[in-house]
């Protein structure tokens, strides 16, 4: 049984096949590949973009979607994760998409469910479809010429599952990664590190990936206010100037904290393209896992 728990679950050949399929899906036309199939979404953490993206992807493939309301589910009343898995399995879905605040939950569910499980984000651990859509966006922009491209990841890297998945995936495709964050947001890593964002770093980057500060994952207050953080790490036109690059963000964007209003409206900022690409990538992932499982 194939699952997508981390980006490591797909090899490079499979990822390139996903990109080819996703490129076809960018026309937004409805398909019938998953007609008669059922996909269950169960998000134990709040989500608007990822949940909507997966559900749009499923419906465009012709599948039915069952969204489980966790706030009213038995899990909120003390049901164990194993019982939740057993009950989900008893509904005989063709795939389950799960998000959870605790790292490792999608993997635990995958061991007790007889259909593909897709990780929609677990704790600080992984967010594989976000990393895939980010690389897909980069790949399309540079027309496949991504090896050696310099990417600067800025923000709360230590607490970001998006950063964790991107670092694994982008390293495999030989992008040159630099991390920029305050010391308390910086993970232990062999990658190049800077503790302040400046013009020289941006001048040497082809891609900037800004991240949201994960205040809900902080055990203590790090900054008196997010404005203090923004003074050092907000992506602003005065820093970027006319540099030829692209700016990415997984969303939601804290305007004037992560990225300035001016840069959000800049044509180099591809946040909305990431959203569009996300639906196409998730279509490709769901189609691959479900049809391979039944083949």
UniProtKB/Swiss-Prot annotation:
Taxonomic superkingdom: Bacteria
InterPro entries xref list: Asp/Orn_carbamoyltranf_P-bd (IPR006132), Asp/Orn_carbamoylTrfase (IPR006130), Asp/Orn_carbamoylTrfase_sf (IPR036901), Asp_carbamoyltransf (IPR002082), Asp_carbamoyltransf_Asp/Orn-bd (IPR006131)
GO BP annotation list: 'de novo' pyrimidine nucleobase biosynthetic process; 'de novo' UMP biosynthetic process; amino acid metabolic process
Catalysed transformations (reactions): carbamoyl phosphate + L-aspartate = N-carbamoyl-L-aspartate + phosphate + H(+)
GO function terms (MF aspect): amino acid binding; aspartate carbamoyltransferase activity
Binding partners and assembly: Heterododecamer (2C3:3R2) of six catalytic PyrB chains organized as two trimers (C3), and six regulatory PyrI chains organized as three dimers (R2).
PANTHER family listed in its UniProt record: ASPARTATE CARBAMOYLTRANSFERASE, ORNITHINE CARBAMOYLTRANSFERASE, MITOCHONDRIAL
Free-text function comment from the UniProt entry: Catalyzes the condensation of carbamoyl phosphate and aspartate to form carbamoyl aspartate and inorganic phosphate, the committed step in the de novo pyrimidine nucleotide biosynthesis pathway.
Official protein name in the record: Aspartate carbamoyltransferase catalytic subunit
């Amino acid at each position: 049984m194939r699952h997508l728990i981390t980006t490591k679950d797909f090899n490079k050949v499979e990822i390139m096949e996903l990109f080819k399929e996703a490129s076809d899906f960018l026309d937004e036309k409805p398909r019938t590949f998953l007609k008669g199939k059922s996909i269950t979404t169960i998000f134990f953490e709040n989500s608007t973009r990822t949940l909507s993206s997966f559900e749009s992807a499923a419906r465009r493939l012709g599948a039915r979607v069952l969204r489980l309301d966790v706030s009213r589910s038995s899990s909120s009343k003390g049901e164990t994760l194993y019982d939740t898995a057993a009950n989900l399995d008893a509904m005989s879905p063709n795939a389950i998409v799960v998000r959870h605040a605790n790292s490792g939950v999608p993997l635990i569910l995958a061991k007790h469910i007889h259909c593909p499980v897709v990780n929609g984000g677990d704790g600080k651990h992984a967010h594989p479809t976000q990393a895939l859509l980010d690389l897909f966006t980069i790949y399309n922009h540079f027309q496949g010429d991504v090896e050696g491209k310099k990417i600067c990841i800025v923000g709360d890297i230590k607490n970001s599952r998006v950063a964790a998945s991107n670092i694994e995936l982008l390293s495999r495709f030989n992008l040159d990664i630099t991390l920029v964050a305050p010391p308390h947001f910086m993970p232990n890593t062999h990658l190049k590190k800077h503790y302040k964002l400046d013009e020289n770093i941006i001048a040497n980057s082809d891609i900037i990936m800004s991240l949201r500060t994960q205040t809900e994952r902080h055990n203590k207050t790090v900054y008196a206010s997010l404005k203090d953080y923004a003074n050092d790490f907000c992506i602003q036109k005065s820093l970027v100037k006319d540099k030829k690059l692209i700016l990415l963000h997984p969303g939601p964007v804290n305007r004037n904290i992560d990225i300035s209003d001016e840069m959000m409206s800049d044509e180099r900022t591809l946040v909305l393209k990431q959203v569009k690409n996300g639906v196409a990538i998730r279509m490709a992932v769901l189609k691959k896992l479900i049809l391979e499982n039944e083949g």
